[in-house]
């Protein structure tokens, strides 16, 4: 945090991906408290959200909802892998989550429904309490990545996690003609 405060841009923000690491809400809470115990509040104020810290088998259970409800000053937590159908986001919100992540592989129309749900909840609360993040997952150019970015923009997702380049060696999956045309 010191390096970002000293050398980073003045308007930086960050997210943390829990990657379903926790099988128990108390485990995550203890980990969170240990992780953040010595961090300055000015740094923690830049956290946008924590993505899916709980394994999908327990993420949408009553016990997680109770734990989130009992946790004062919990970080904003969103679902990702648990967002399997159009009922997932409303259930997550009822349990105390603050939103979801959109990936085209989850369904473009489901993403539109989720965005409408989030916008409606924010209008009702009068704040920007609920949110949607974006990810490209494993999309690469020349077509899928562009389509994904258009959908993310249409949904109003300004910050999109870029993952596709981790799984593919550039455009090497395409024949030479496509690679040359892209360049």
Predicted regions and their residues:
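Flexible C-terminal active-site loop/helix
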Residues: 124-183
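Catalytic core of soluble alpha/beta enzymes
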Residues: 1-143
């Amino acid at each position: 945090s010191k390096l970002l405060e000293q050398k980073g841009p003045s308007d930086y923000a960050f997210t943390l991906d829990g990657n379903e690491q926790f099988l128990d809400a108390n485990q995550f809470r203890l980990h969170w408290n240990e992780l953040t115990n010595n961090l300055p509040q000015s740094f923690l104020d830049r956290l946008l959200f924590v993505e899916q810290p709980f394994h999908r088998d327990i993420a949408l259970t009553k016990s997680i909802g109770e734990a989130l409800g009992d946790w004062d000053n919990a970080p904003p937590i969103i679902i990702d892998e648990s967002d399997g159908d159009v009922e997932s986001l409303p259930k997550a919100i009822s349990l105390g989550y603050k939103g979801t992540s959109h990936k085209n592989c989850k369904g473009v129309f489901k993403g539109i429904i989720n965005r409408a749900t989030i916008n409606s909840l924010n209008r009702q609360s009068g704040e920007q309490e609920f949110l949607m993040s974006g990810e490209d997952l494993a999309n690469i150019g020349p077509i899928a990545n562009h389509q994904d970015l258009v959908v993310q923009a249409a949904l109003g997702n300004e910050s999109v996690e870029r993952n596709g380049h981790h799984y593919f060696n550039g455009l090497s999956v395409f024949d030479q003609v496509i690679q040359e045309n892209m360049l």
